[in-house]
Amino acid sequence: MFDKLLSTPLVTAAAASLDLVAFPCAGSGSAGLRGWREILPADWRFTIACLPGRETSYGQPFARDMARLADDIAQELRGRRAQHPDLPLVLFGHSMGGLLAQLVAHRVPADALVVAACPPPGRRDAEDDGRPLDHDELRREVAGMLQAVSPIEPGLLDELVGLTAPVLAADIELLATYRAPTTPLSCGIWALYGDGDPIEPLPWAAETTAAAECRVLSGSHFFVQESPRAVVAELRRCLTPVRGGKA
């Protein structure tokens, strides 16, 4: 069992209007989403899932089973929400993080699920289903992800790619263990896509008995890192009903 899988939020539950938990894409960690703290509404309690084997848990074994990882995150999240269980809960996941967020939503009832650059279960291609990437493919994927956050000097980029490639490889193996839930959620699901991403923008209508919306924003598969303000603006728009009408 893994522990300390969630970052420490800066806003206390008592002062918050919404509990937002974000799940990064494969191969990354919390660093790519920390900047959201500066642009999210001040009364949103923001937490990032910190997966094993990277950042503060560097050297820890990687997670090998997505369902068990979702169990561990859900247990920690339930404990954190125990004193304020009625605070609206929203789970956000980027790419692989969207599938992990979906599994957690089946374990901890959420008020909304937002997935980014993540096709619905059953519409994922072979690469999305955990096919191992060769050395060159891994390097291209990692370089694209890192450059989406900010431009990096070529020499430093090579070093960062070398450090990050094993994380992405482990996450691709983790993705291969994903099994789609057999029952739908009861919360709304918003699916966000980049207009430069080859993924076909489709709603997650089969995964919920509630509303399922699909929106296309400007950017590549890594539009979450490329245009964080646009993503946060879209979150504010789609989550207005969850916050009782407050934008």
Regions found by a protein language model. Give the residues of each.
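Non-catalytic, mobile gating and regulatory segments of ester bond hydrolases
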Residues: 1-247
